[in-house]
C-alpha cells in the first residue's frame, strides 16, 4: 500500500496557539504517518532545514508568505460584509490556506506522474495535529487509518456539520484528494453574488436548521425544512467550512455514506 501525506501552511500555527507541535518536533503527527511519503508546502522559510530534517519529504516548497494582491484584486467590488449568519472569513487567509494545501497536493501529483503510479491513500493536513488551540480543538486530533475504504472521504467529526466541514485534515483516494484541492481554483466562481454557492447561502443552506445550528441534519432521516439564511442582499460569505461543504456536495462526496466523520467519541463528554 502506497501512502502519501501532504502537509501545508504555517508549521508553527498562526493566530491560534498551536506551536506545541513545533516544540515537540511533530512527534504526535509522525506517529500517525510513519512510513508514508511526505510532501510539504510551507510559508515558514526560516525553519526549512529543520522541517526537512524532521519529515524527510519526497518533495517540498518553502516560500515567503504570498500577499495574493493580484488574486484579491479579482474580487474588487464583491461585498464581503460582516453581517452574516455565521462567521465571515478573511479573503487573504482563505486564499493562503487553500493555495498552500493545493500546492502540497500538486507536489504529490507531479511525483505520481513522474513515476507512473497513484497513491492508494492520501492524507492532506495542517502541521499542528493534536495541538491546535493547545490541543483543545477536537477537530485537530488525527484519526488516520489507511486500511479504510478510500472511495470515501474521511474528516474530523464536529458539531457544526450543518455549516460545513471541519477542514483541519482529510484523507481518501488520490483522485478524491486531487478534487478536494480544486476548491482554490473555484473561489472566483463561488465568491460572487450570482453563484450557486451564494444563492444557497441566501435562500437556504442545505442540511441546516435555523432553529438549531448543532442539530447534525446530515445524519438525520427526517431533515429540517427550516434552513439557515447566511447572507442577504449582495453580500457574499467567505467561510472555509461552508465552501468545503459546497465543494464536496458538487463532487457527490458530502452524502452521509461518502463523507465519514471520525472521532465522534471526543464530543461525548
Residue positions per predicted region:
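N-proximal low-complexity "stem/linker" segments adjacent to membrane-targeting elements
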Residues: 1-20
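Catalytic core and acceptor-binding pocket of nucleotide-sugar-dependent glycosyltransferases
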Residues: 90-98, 102-103, 112, 116-117, ...
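Short, flexible loop/turn elements at secondary-structure junctions
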Residues: 7-12, 42-44, 123-131, 159, ...
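Short, acidic, metal-binding catalytic loop of nucleotide-sugar glycosyltransferases
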Residues: 20-36
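A short acidic (Asp/Glu
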Residues: 15-19, 49-52, 131-138, 142, ...
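Short, aromatic/basic amphipathic alpha-helical patches
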Residues: 24, 49-58, 137-145, 248
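Active-site-proximal specificity loops/subdomain of glycosyltransferases
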Residues: 41-115
Amino acid at each position: 500500500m502506497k501512502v502519501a501525506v501532504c502537509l501545508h501552511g504555517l508549521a508553527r500555527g498562526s493566530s491560534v496557539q498551536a506551536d506545541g507541535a513545533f516544540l515537540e518536533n511533530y512527534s504526535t503527527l509522525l506517529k500517525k504517518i510513519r512510513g508514508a511519503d511526505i510532501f510539504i508546502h510551507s510559508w515558514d522559510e526560516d525553519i526549512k532545514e529543520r522541517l526537512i530534517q524532521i519529515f524527510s519529504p519526497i518533495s517540498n516548497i518553502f516560500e515567503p508568505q504570498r500577499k495574493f494582491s493580484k488574486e484579491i484584486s479579482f474580487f474588487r467590488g464583491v461585498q464581503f460584509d460582516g453581517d452574516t449568519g455565521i462567521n465571515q472569513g478573511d479573503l487573504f487567509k482563505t486564499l493562503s490556506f487553500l493555495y498552500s494545501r493545493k500546492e502540497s497536493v500538486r507536489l504529490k501529483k507531479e511525483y505520481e506522474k513522474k513515476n507512473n503510479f497513484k497513491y492508494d491513500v492520501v492524507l492532506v493536513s495542517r502541521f499542528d495535529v493534536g495541538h491546535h488551540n493547545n490541543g483543545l480543538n477536537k477537530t485537530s486530533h488525527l484519526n488516520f487509518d489507511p486500511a479504510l475504504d478510500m472511495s470515501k472521504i474521511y474528516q474530523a467529526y464536529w458539531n457544526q456539520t450543518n455549516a460545513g466541514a471541519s477542514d483541519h485534515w482529510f484523507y481518501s483516494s488520490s483522485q478524491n484528494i486531487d478534487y478536494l484541492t480544486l476548491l482554490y481554483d473555484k473561489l472566483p466562481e463561488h465568491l460572487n453574488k450570482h453563484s450557486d454557492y451564494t444563492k444557497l447561502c441566501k435562500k437556504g443552506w442545505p442540511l441546516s436548521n435555523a432553529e438549531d445550528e448543532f442539530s447534525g441534519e446530515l445524519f438525520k432521516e427526517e431533515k429540517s425544512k427550516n434552513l439557515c439564511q447566511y447572507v442577504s442582499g449582495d453580500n457574499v460569505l467567505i467561510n472555509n467550512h461552508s465552501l468545503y461543504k459546497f465543494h464536496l456536495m458538487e463532487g457527490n462526496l458530502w452524502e452521509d455514506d461518502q463523507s465519514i466523520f471520525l472521532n465522534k467519541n471526543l464530543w461525548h463528554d
